[in-house]
Amino acid sequence: MAAQQRDCGGAAQLAGPAAEADPLGRFTCPVCLEVYEKPVQVPCGHVFCSACLQECLKPKKPVCGVCRSALAPGVRAVELERQIESTETSCHGCRKNFFLSKIRSHVATCSKYQNYIMEGVKATIKDASLQPRNVPNRYTFPCPYCPEKNFDQEGLVEHCKLFHSTDTKSVVCPICASMPWGDPNYRSANFREHIQRRHRFSYDTFVDYDVDEEDMMNQVLQRSIIDQ
């Protein structure tokens, strides 16, 4: 999927097939890559989750991660919040429709969605067993800003805090990209804040990639449910 670009109204602009493939992209926060939670529109026109914006405002001279203009506290995006409350999407498991504001709580308890996740993990494992050389490295990661590499998750977080605290370039998260559920082409508008919010823990704490297939699937499933 191509990197998202947002207009002054905060809606993601995707052209052609990309727009059709990601019709809900305009409801996605460019920092945490989740559906907006308490969306706030800042003076430059872009929108962030309230909690994500607070993190982005912490530097002495904060900038918008999308357009790099000076960042300041914003106002509640009431219209966008209304759209999140009224826009429907379907559960990949049971295929029932739910409002965006309700889908997370639904999938956490939907047994068919859990089966959908298991089938996806099973397919990933099967493909990896057929092409072992293409299995992504989930233990060490390169810095997306510079040539440094071989960081564990915690090391990558610390490296970016120390050496890239002012770099606002949109980059692909190497941790997300290595996971079965990750999108290797999705660029986070503020990668440093993204990894601090989304990767405070190591996946190895929850998933042992050396255990048998069934145990691994169950561990990944539990992690995905918790993250919803």
Curated annotation (Swiss-Prot):
The modification N6-acetyllysine is found at residues 102, 112. Autoubiquitinated. Polyubiquitinated in the presence of E2 enzymes UBE2D1, UBE2D2 and UBE2D3, but only monoubiquitinated in the presence of UBE2E1. SMART domains: RING. It catalyses: S-ubiquitinyl-[E2 ubiquitin-conjugating enzyme]-L-cysteine + [acceptor protein]-L-lysine = [E2 ubiquitin-conjugating enzyme]-L-cysteine + N(6)-ubiquitinyl-[acceptor protein]-L-lysine. Expressed in numerous tissues, including skin, CD4 lymphocytes and dendritic cells. Highest levels in testis. PROSITE patterns: ZF_C2HC_RNF (PS51803), ZF_RING_1 (PS00518), ZF_RING_2 (PS50089). It is found in: Cytoplasm; Nucleus. It comes from the Eukaryota. The keyword Metal-binding applies. A zinc finger (C2HC RNF-type) spans 91-110. InterPro entries: Di19_Zn-bd (IPR008598), RNF114_RING-HC (IPR042716), RNF_E3_ubiq-protein_ligase (IPR051438), ZF_C2HC_RNF (IPR034734), Znf-RING_euk (IPR027370), Znf_RING (IPR001841), Znf_RING/FYVE/PHD (IPR013083), Znf_RING_CS (IPR017907). Zn(2+) binds at residues 91, 94, 106, 110. GO terms for biological process: cell differentiation; protein polyubiquitination; spermatogenesis; ubiquitin-dependent protein catabolic process. Interacts with XAF1, the interaction increases XAF1 stability and proapoptotic effects, and may regulate IFN signaling. E3 ubiquitin-protein ligase that promotes the ubiquitination of various substrates. In turn, participates in the regulation of many biological processes including cell cycle, apoptosis, osteoclastogenesis as well as innate or adaptive immunity. Acts as a negative regulator of NF-kappa-B-dependent transcription by promoting the ubiquitination and stabilization of the NF-kappa-B inhibitor TNFAIP3. May promote the ubiquitination of TRAF6 as well. Also acts as a negative regulator of T-cell activation. This is E3 ubiquitin-protein ligase RNF114. It comes from Homo sapiens.
